[in-house]
Amino acid sequence: MRSMAKKGLEEVLETLDRIIHDETVPRNVRRVASEIKEKLTTTDEVSLEAASAISVLEDISADPNLPMHVRTMIWNLTSQLERISVE
């Protein structure tokens, strides 16, 4: 993996950690973030898992119970994952 993609992945994992440990985030969203993190860290096909994660994140960003700051974090995650899936 290229260094730019590796750095991008590290940023994604940090953001996922913040979502997972934020008590204001609904439990189902924290669970999904945890699953995405696990898939990204255990696969050899990071670009494929990044594309899959984008789809899931777009679905949960529409959750009406999601705090606005978390929705913004999810949109930023999606943007970062798009860069990883292309590389």
Curated annotation (Swiss-Prot):
InterPro entries: Ta0600-like_sf (IPR023130), UPF0147 (IPR005354). Disulfide bonds: none annotated. SUPFAM superfamilies: Ta0600-like. Coiled coil: none annotated. Belongs to the UPF0147 family. This is UPF0147 protein AF_2370.1. It comes from Archaeoglobus fulgidus (strain ATCC 49558 / DSM 4304 / JCM 9628 / NBRC 100126 / VC-16). The lineage of its organism: Archaea, Methanobacteriati, Methanobacteriota, Archaeoglobi, Archaeoglobales.
